[in-house]
């Protein structure tokens, strides 16, 4: 019997989101497509309230908010709660301008001999993820972002989003399929040993530009990202919803 060839619908996967503004800010492979949610929400009444009990990267919440709806989503992972809040928040022109002005300040911190990096996270065999030069750069950059003086903490959020993009981009992890693997360490080196800081700075600068390019695209609706266990929804949300969209397994 001839095998049936099934064409992959990339437009229903995370790849469709890559260049769609805030949806592409930070890629996590299992994320599903914006198109999927838009099609499901399309027939809702104007005052509909949307629930996603498994937020993930908050694709549902952001889609609903962009279409003017009220959305709530639940996530047990604190980092994903932070990411969902960052993606669905409003950013003022002042916040965006302040953020863009920090590139030079961060560069000065990175090049300062007195700059002290944050401690690297206690990951087993961390050099399997980042080479020593990259790890040193990332630890100094994180310290700079943490300590830079800002009047608006939303600016720090944008700086951290760009940091996450750079951290993933410069890692040895390969995200081209669902089960993560590692790149060949011999082919990993993007840059030579000399002036690696300057090259890494360029990567971060480009990632920050990408984040800022859609930061002003504030959603017209609202989204609440709740840190909690979706098995106990009745303790986390106390009102009814018109549509429930759950993440795919």
Task: Pin down the residues of each PLM region.
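SAM-dependent nucleic-acid methyltransferase catalytic core
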Residues: 135-246
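Short linear capping/connector segments at secondary-structure termini
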Residues: 17-19, 119-124, 179-183
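Conserved phosphoryl-transfer catalytic core
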Residues: 77-148
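Hydrophobic (often cysteine-bearing) scaffold residues that line and stabilize catalytic clefts
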Residues: 29, 33, 80, 134, ...
